[in-house]
């Protein structure tokens, strides 16, 4: 899982380290995400969860947050039952992500992916509520933010916005 604005970073790291194309899902407000909405973009909740087909093949039940280890949060949850290759891969994923978040010219956050998600959600809500409620003002606000972000990105690409100014704007968002 990851927030929309982190998809480019997550995609590049997962492809480089794991050789896989990530499947994106917006994080649930659960577990380590209980404190979502404090201004931190998040990613990698359930990153090594066993795929449903493999879990079914093994006869395991669904558990979240542990990669599919059915001993999770029991007295049997000890290091020797962990899949060391998965642990090493996860460590590499986390370290490369941290490196890219801390050693950058431009902060690797794409806020326009978030505005696209907001716009899509507003369209779905408008379709669901029909004429009972008008979400046009909210949609206009998202559109205005997206246009401002497009100008910022164009300024970055064209060199008229410095890395310092771009990163300050991205952090402030």
For each predicted feature, which ranges?
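Metal-dependent peptidase/peptidase-like ectodomains
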Residues: 1-71, 83, 129-172
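A structural signal for alpha-helix termini and helix-coil/disorder junctions
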Residues: 16, 100-104, 124
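Catalytic-domain carbohydrate-binding cleft regions of carbohydrate-active enzymes
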Residues: 34-37, 110-117, 124-126
């Amino acid at each position: 899982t990851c927030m929309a604005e982190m998809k480019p970073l997550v995609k590049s790291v997962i492809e480089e380290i794991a050789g896989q194309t990530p499947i994106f899902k917006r994080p649930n407000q659960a577990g380590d995400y209980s404190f979502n909405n404090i201004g931190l973009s998040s990613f990698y909740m359930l990153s090594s969860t066993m795929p449903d087909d493999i879990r079914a093949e093994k006869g395991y039940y669904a558990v979240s947050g542990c990669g599919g280890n059915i001993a999770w949060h029991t007295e049997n949850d000890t290091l020797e039952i962990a899949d060391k290759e998965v642990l090493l891969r996860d460590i590499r994923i986390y370290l490369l992500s941290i490196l890219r978040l801390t050693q950058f010219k431009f902060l690797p956050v794409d806020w326009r992916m978030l505005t696209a998600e907001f716009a899509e959600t507003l369209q779905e809500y408008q379709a669901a509520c029909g004429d009972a409620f008008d979400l046009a003002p909210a949609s206009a606000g998202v559109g205005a933010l997206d246009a401002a972000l497009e100008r910022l990105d164009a300024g970055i690409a064209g060199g008229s916005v410095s890395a310092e100014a771009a990163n300050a704007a991205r952090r402030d968002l």
